[in-house]
Amino acid sequence: MLCDRLWRNARLATLAEGAPGLGLVEDGLIAARDGRILYAGPARAAPAFAARETVDCEGRWITPGLIDCHTHLVHGGDRAAEFEARLAGASYEEIARAGGGIVSTVRATRAASEDALVGSALRRLDALIAEGVTAVEVKSGYGLSVASERASLRAARRLGESRDVTVTTTFLGAHALPPEEPDKDRYIAHVCTEMLPALAREGLADAVDAFCEGIAFSPAQTARVFEAARAAGLPVKLHADQLSDLGGAALAARFGALSADHLEYADEAGAAALARAGTVAVLLPGAFYFIRETRRPPVDLFRRHGTRMALATDCNPGTSPLTSLLLVLNMGATLFRLTVEECLAGVTREAARALGRLHEIGTLEAGKWCDLAVWDVERPAELVYRMGFNPLHARIRRGR
């Protein structure tokens, strides 16, 4: 059988659906043609391949390319000065009254050109790519006007044109109130009738997100956004139950959301609802760490009910200025007490599920895109165990 490229003498963590554990294969082989996997499994069971190029992996481990399924890569400015103020004892409320917080990022994002947004986001994206990331989700949400949200989503699309990476875009117009609009209901009406339909028509968004929280939008307001997304034919995601239990997990499940993210305050009913709906719980330990949260997501409840769990950086300027998915692996284990298997599945198979792309990425299985990360480690657990260490040997996207 003819193939473009063959990786031999490799150890595989396939993460395949239904495989025990990480789907480990000690003497493995991967064959690819036209960017897709033809075979991934034991060398002894492989068909006879005639390869244009053969790569000897010398016993290295291969995993699926890593996936960061929750980021806010596109934004103007930073919030380093606020970080210093917080260290000096200033509260979030004091910072906000002084013109800081998310409003400061909105102003900086609106003031930046689309080219400038692309340039700054590429620096953050490059840090992720250097750790084996082959797919990333990018949200808008710092423009909060049709023009600025359009620019943010266009910038996100351009990231995938500028780098060899799969980019999924998410419209997050219901992120916060813009500084010029004091009325939440009126703003949500604008999101639903003007912003979302326009950006959906232009094909700029692959999904729609919202922030359901006391400091953001109510469950009823969030439901209006999700109804508008449904009318536009777009799947939904939700920032849910991060700071309080507003029933966000159950709301996400009711709308069949791809994912519900954060979830520190989710309850058992919410965990069960997520499992029934097939909605992935995306856990974000970077934000938990950075803003010194003390309440962990209810991981034991997710396990009990069979809720799928993913991990992501939540890279954003205010609460998680983090561009290391490898560090997130360690944080997931140490802060949230996930197992090695849960962590690695959380940045591959379950992250793909959270983006609605499991049919094409996230595991090493025939028919999927040949997105690989090759690692200089003795065992996959090292990827979770080590901190501040990047053992990536090679990153392959679509067989190249």
From Swiss-Prot:
User: Is DNA damage a UniProt keyword of this protein?
Assistant: no
Q: How is the cofactor bound?
A: Binds 1 zinc or iron ion per subunit.
List localization entries: Cytoplasm
InterPro entries documented for this protein? Amidohydro-rel (IPR006680), HutI (IPR005920), Metal-dep_hydrolase_composite (IPR011059), Metal_Hydrolase (IPR032466)
Q: What is its main location?
A: cytoplasm
| Superkingdom, taxonomy of origin | Bacteria
- Cofactor(s) it depends on: Zn(2+); Fe(3+)
Checking Gene3D superfamilies in the record gives: Metal-dependent hydrolases, Urease, subunit C, domain 1
Query: Does the keyword Nucleus belong to this entry?
Result: no
What does the record give as the reaction this protein catalyses?
Answer: 4-imidazolone-5-propanoate + H2O = N-formimidoyl-L-glutamate
- Name any GO cellular component annotation: cytoplasm
Q: Which GO terms describe its molecular function?
A: imidazolonepropionase activity; iron ion binding; zinc ion binding
- Identify the residues that bind Zn(2+): 70, 72, 239, 314
Q: Which Pfam families match?
A: Amidohydro_1 (PF01979)
The UniProt entry, under PANTHER family, shows: IMIDAZOLONEPROPIONASE, IMIDAZOLONEPROPIONASE-RELATED
Give the matching NCBIfam families: hutI (TIGR01224)
Record's function text? Catalyzes the hydrolytic cleavage of the carbon-nitrogen bond in imidazolone-5-propanoate to yield N-formimidoyl-L-glutamate. It is the third step in the universal histidine degradation pathway.
Entry protein name = Imidazolonepropionase
Query: Which organism does this sequence originate in?
Result: Methylobacterium sp. (strain 4-46)
Give the gene name: hutI
